[in-house]
Amino acid sequence: MQLNPSEISDLIKSRIQNLQLAATSRNEGTVVSVTDGITRIHGLTDVMQGEMLEFPGNTFGLALNLERDSVGAVVLGEYEHITEGDTVKATGRILEVPVGPELIGRVVNALGQPIDGKGPINAKLTDKIEKVAPGVIARQSVSQPVQTGLKSVDSMVPIGRGQRELIIGDRQTGKTAVAVDAIINQKGQNMFCVYVAIGQKASTIANVVRKLEENGAMEYTIVVAATASESAAMQYLSAYAGCTMGEYFRDRGQDALIVYDDLTKQAWAYRQVSLLLRRPPGREAYPGDVFYLHSRLLERAARVNADYVEKFTNGEVKGKTGSLTALPVIETQAGDVSAFVPTNVISITDGQIFLETDLFNAGIRPAINAGISVSRVGGAAQTKVVKKLSGGIRTDLAQYRELAAFAQFASDLDDATRKQLERGRRVTELMKQPQYAPLSVAEMAITLYAVNNGYFDDVEVARVLAFESGLQQFVKAKAPELVAKITDTKELDADGEKTLVAAIAEFKKSWA
């Protein structure tokens, strides 16, 4: 085929006319100083707060301090190769992380990059890590339960979908154990889980992931890990990244549970970043906005109404509410709940589960202090059967603790007091539960009914847990239809009660 010169010139002209050249104008600055992962940059005049900055060597940073003649930024990742005089580009984008079902079963870092060696994550969507919490009109009251499978939690401090329930206690009191048990118990409950590990040892996180895998919980769980060896900036951002991943499910009419383990270390990381950015320190050297640090994170956990979900999904999902339930963890120093960060988070959340060192060391695990642990909104969401049967448990325990303190000094006790002490000892023993062994609603109902009606009163304290285990196995074998009915309806009617009483009486005869 031969082309004449005029055709060639026409072809070239048409190619030139159709050439798509997208010219982008990006602001550039110069690195003035680099210290401990914090850079000062001169010349970025129109950068936004929280904007991503591009450093040489495919490294990114986050603009946090906007000053008159310079910008203070944290480097996300390695910063050893960055030197004074390097060019920094503004990207015009706020920090985003991948979201969606593709992340389920994976372990990622604070930027959503996989760190579990299972290959890349092909997520179709990304979302901003900093988002405004749903407004008052978009919310719906908490009315559906989150079953943790722990007798002491579900009976005394129930948690509802969309609630923020703080887990607080000293180190080594079983805070992570309560949170991990709650995740394991969500199997088959249509609940997606996000576990955010902040500032923990890599070996500890690996152990949690292994336990979740062994119990089949990684099938619905995302793990976001910012280990102790990572930069303070990554530890500070990881909680927001995890929250964004959880919000993906909430906004599409599904339910999600997020555990922040723990927010004390996140506050420490933020304090470190703030001091390096030369922000003025306040109480305990924290910056002035440390309350806002946690409030803007925890307010994003909410139950949103069907209108919000329908609007968000452009009518694809109708008649469904979505929820994000948060279980933040706070570590106290020598039981001091009046320190700065614990009081802040207590005031933000809808209740707290307080774990005590003394109870833990006495072998009462989970070591929940019934007196000062509360759930402000969970009562409305509690399963009907558990709510009906657990009314006396909290009172029994609280009165027992008070009487036990007096009984140490009193030599002669009247029968009523002695009976109350005996009941209290058995209830305390009954609230013990091994790790990774959550109970179903039916199993919990059997136990609570038996203790409320005095069936444990003549059982030796040392044999209470054996009696409970035997009773549950017996009822499940003798009355499987009752167990199935309680599981389905979450209620115990008069007929069910008769069947249960007969089964317990029969078991007590055979118990020796």
From Swiss-Prot:
EC number: 7.1.2.2
Family per similarity comment: Belongs to the ATPase alpha/beta chains family.
Function: Produces ATP from ADP in the presence of a proton gradient across the membrane. The alpha chain is a regulatory subunit.
Database matches in CDD domains: ATP-synt_F1_alpha_C (cd18113), ATP-synt_F1_alpha_N (cd18116), F1-ATPase_alpha_CD (cd01132)
Membrane topology annotation: Peripheral membrane protein
Organism this protein belongs to: Azoarcus sp. (strain BH72)
Protein name listed in UniProt: ATP synthase subunit alpha
Taxonomy of the source species: Bacteria, Pseudomonadati, Pseudomonadota, Betaproteobacteria, Rhodocyclales
InterPro entries recorded: ATP_synth_asu-like_sf, ATP_synth_asu_C, ATP_synth_asu_C_sf, ATP_synth_F1_a_nt-bd_dom, ATP_synth_F1_asu, ATPase_a/bsu_AS, ATPase_F1/V1/A1_a/bsu_N, ATPase_F1/V1/A1_a/bsu_N_sf
Reaction catalysed by this enzyme: ATP + H2O + 4 H(+)(in) = ADP + phosphate + 5 H(+)(out)
Localization, UniProt: Cell inner membrane
GO molecular function, one term: ATP binding
A Gene Ontology cellular-component term: proton-transporting ATP synthase complex
Sequence positions that bind ATP: G169, D170, R171, Q172, T173, G174, K175, T176
Positions marked as site (Required for activity): S373
Keywords: ATP synthesis, ATP-binding, Cell inner membrane, Cell membrane, CF(1), Hydrogen ion transport, Ion transport, Membrane, Nucleotide-binding, Translocase, Transport
Name of the top EC class for this enzyme: translocase
Quaternary structure annotation from Swiss-Prot or TrEMBL: F-type ATPases have 2 components, CF(1) - the catalytic core - and CF(0) - the membrane proton channel. CF(1) has five subunits: alpha(3), beta(3), gamma(1), delta(1), epsilon(1). CF(0) has three main subunits: a(1), b(2) and c(9-12). The alpha and beta chains form an alternating ring which encloses part of the gamma chain. CF(1) is attached to CF(0) by a central stalk formed by the gamma and epsilon chains, while a peripheral stalk is formed by the delta and b chains.
